[in-house]
Amino acid sequence: ENLFLDLDDYDFVDLRMILGSLDQESFSLIGRSKMINYWRRNSKYCGACGKKTDFISSEEAFQCSCNNEFIYPKISPCIITLIHRGDEILLGRSKHFPKGMFSTLAGFIEPGESCEEALVREVKEEVGINVKNIKYFSSQNWPFPSQLMIGYFAEYDSGEIILEDEEIEEAYWFNLNKLPSIPPEGSISGLLIRSYIEDHS
């Protein structure tokens, strides 16, 4: 029996491109698969000595004989935040985004930081403003390649937009009735934006 798929009638697509057509359960399943595959590809050799590692099925981890430590999947925590000011929200545009798309701000949590501290720092570094009244929204696995996105709402406090991060090309305040192209609902950034609109419409 032929167990291989005939792929002549199929195309490989970037997972980001089909976010809008996936329900949360499907995205979580695909995301888990992608993250585990990335971890397995990048854990074949020990980072301490360079020797080939062994996969220990009972532990679901790789292990090297040089120190017997287990190598588990690594997840990088990131904050992502929607900054609001009444009927306006602050959205930024990364150079990696599709043309015309704007999104919420995000960044990695550094060692020793809480989520809230990382949020305040990232916002200040990226757009130069201060925020207050930080409120947790939700989280989402983000397999590009292995992030956990931790979403928050944050209220504008003070300052003017000053772009100090090379990743951000543009950032503006947008009225809720005049938004640019935004991420799909399947992404946590899209969910943050739509949730705020629903609560303030």
Question: Where in the sequence are the language-model features?
Answer:
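Nudix hydrolase/Nudix homology domain
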Residues: 1-43, 54, 98-102, 164-201
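Acidic, metal-coordinating catalytic segment for phosphate/diphosphate chemistry
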Residues: 30, 35-80
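Short, contiguous, pocket-lining structural segments
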Residues: 37-41, 73, 84, 94-96, ...
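N-terminal strand-loop-strand
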Residues: 58-103, 130-131, 154
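Nucleotide phosphate-binding site architecture
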Residues: 90, 110, 180
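The catalytic Nudix box helix
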Residues: 103-138, 152, 160
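Active-site-adjacent beta-strand/loop module that shapes the phosphate/pyrophosphate-binding cleft
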Residues: 140-162
